[in-house]
Amino acid sequence: MNKVVLYCRPGFEKECAAEITDKAARREVFGFARVKENAGYVVFECYQPDDADKLVRELPFSSLIFARQMFVAGELLRDLPPEDRISPISGMLQGVVEKGGDLRVEVADTNESKELMKFCRKLTVPLRAALREVGVLTNYETPKRPVVHVFFIAPGCCYTGYSYTTNNSPFYMGIPRLRFPSDAPSRSTLKLEEAFHVFIPADEWDERLANGMHAVDLGACPGGWTYQLVKRNMWVASVDNGPMAQSLMDTGQVTWLREDGFRYRPTRNNITWMVCDMVEKPAKVAALMATWLVNGWCRETIFNLKLPMKKRYEEVSQNLAYIQEQLNAQGINAEIQARQLYHDREEVTVHVRRWWAAVGGRRDER
């Protein structure tokens, strides 16, 4: 198996392809990406047969911006016989995967592919039983073993392969299933909720999204992102010239500051979270975020970068590199991650967690 299949948002196949080609080459894995416009996936074909496994093992999935999922795959199975689709799939996986811990029968996130969802659900149970019988799957689900993927791109056509639970998306199709809360002021609230799921391990939520924390929301109106912070019982300074939803103001946890988010400067030094979803050029937002981080005005931040029409991967890479350079210049350690979330559109969401350097009034964190 010498291919890596990557799921992505339809319309962003070129960005996904540019990213995997670039980051694979940095690890001395060379190949070429097969791209079909608006397909919702990319196939990166490695020149060396073992390099696909190397890539899926060693390239941190968390470092990918435009991919929702990645797995090692073999040749495309075509024209599966309607009377027996299971045998060719089972045959393709035998000798490749031994005792996988989970099975995901998936499709791309397109309207055309979604018509196959009912079929995928129907196929999953008998396919799981057949794969257990031949040892491709264990007799019980376990997160300690590889995930077996069967990815249908059309009726009777699928890629088969595997990913590692330590380096993949835990979500079916790479998409967290979130429900829009009826009392939220806007649908943008789902962006921040998804970002929490993607960037913060579930076992760290109680510590890093704790009751009583202080947070700032830049460009907050009408309050979709503030809602997520209030929901976690934080005290929020919501900065925007536009009004906040009255339901949020009634909680008593929100202070509305009628100011421009780019001009606002915090007056307290115990802010844990700063979040920002402003419609502005990405370079301008990146510069503002770097200012907050370098000055130690917050401990963690989640913000959106709106994407241009062309060279979107290059633009995001430049913005992230700028933030990293500003932090490096001050000797500040930080963890930077970016992802085009399911609820994002022409944008990517960035998370930065700062590890405190020597700034007055701060304790050192290692």
Curated annotation (Swiss-Prot):
GO cellular component: cytoplasm
Biological processes, Gene Ontology terms: methylation; rRNA processing
Domain of life: Bacteria
GO molecular function, one term: S-adenosylmethionine-dependent methyltransferase activity
Binding site for S-adenosyl-L-methionine: S188, C221, P222, G223, G224, D240, D260, D277
Chief localisation class: cytoplasm
Keyword rRNA processing assigned: yes
EC number annotated for this UniProt entry: 2.1.1.186
Family: Belongs to the class I-like SAM-binding methyltransferase superfamily. RNA methyltransferase RlmE family. RlmM subfamily.
Oligomeric form and interacting partners: Monomer.
UniProt-recorded name of the protein: Ribosomal RNA large subunit methyltransferase M
Organism: Enterobacter sp. (strain 638)
Gene transcribed to yield this protein: rlmM
